Amino acid sequence: MSAKPFILVLALACADARAEKTNFTSGLLAGINGVFDDLGSLAGGPPTVCHINCHHPDTIREALKKPATGHIAYLAKVRRIVEQQTGLPYAVVHYSQLSGGSLDRTRIKAVLITMMDKGISSNHTARLLATIRATNLPTFGFCGGHQKIAEAFGGKVVKMRPLAPGEKDPHPARYPGLFKEWAFLPVKIVKRDLLFDGFGDTVVVREYHAYEIKRLPEEFDLLASNDACRVQAIKHKSRLLYGTQFHPEHFDVEHPDGEKILRNFFKTAGILKPDTSTTERPTTP
């Protein structure tokens, strides 16, 4: 049996149905089969990458009707990236299974957090934020995960702004009437960090958002910014706890910076597999 460590991918998305998963017959996840692992089983299981999903169960049920697209395809993509970059297998847990110290009671060695849609309840959201505060594992949040990290420490997340009269909406189907970043866009590095090792002053990364962190908690440093959204990348001052407003998991041949940023995180966490490359076309989450 390999002695490689766990990674926990705290993801606010859906799950890859390829691996063997738990079938839930009761509770919030009733009827969602072949998607989630049991968090408790990871404590004594083999080293793995675990992706914690924070979407509403109804969103997941709807996504399962078209598994080749949307959230299911997105999770399959994240699985490929993580497994190829780290050499570790991959599991998925729903955020409703979390309690404050549940991550640290496993053999998990790192955490990734991605997007979130509508919450289940204020109690479940509070448990997620408590888990983020409690864990000492290396952690990296993307987009909605980045925002939840800030909220966990008292930060404020707001809509960016309304569209100006005559201003073009790059994606009217999502957040209509709001200004949004919705493309590969340049972001300026304002504080050097290992997350941006090997880059110059700017990275070009995929944005999908209409909300932003307006008030950054004092426990965090600002690492990257642009004119449209000041808080593009953050790091906790005393922990390996990162967030990016952009999506590093979305990259392609013409825009490879996200792949390198992920590699830098895995390297910082001590789990990077040497000589990995996973460049591919992006998939909308």
Question: Predicted segment positions?
Answer:
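Sec-dependent signal peptide recognition
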Residues: 1-9
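Boundary at the C-terminal end of the N-terminal hydrophobic targeting segment
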Residues: 15-19
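Acyltransferase
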Residues: 22-40, 58-59, 246-285
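A short, charged/proline- and glycine-enriched loop
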Residues: 42-49
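Short hydrophobic segments within beta-strands
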Residues: 52-55
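Glycine- and acidic-residue-enriched helix-capping/strand-helix junction motifs
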Residues: 60-75
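Flexible gly/pro-rich beta->alpha loop and the following alpha-helix that scaffold active-site loops
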Residues: 80-142, 153
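Pocket-forming structural segment of enzyme catalytic cores
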Residues: 154-237, 246-256
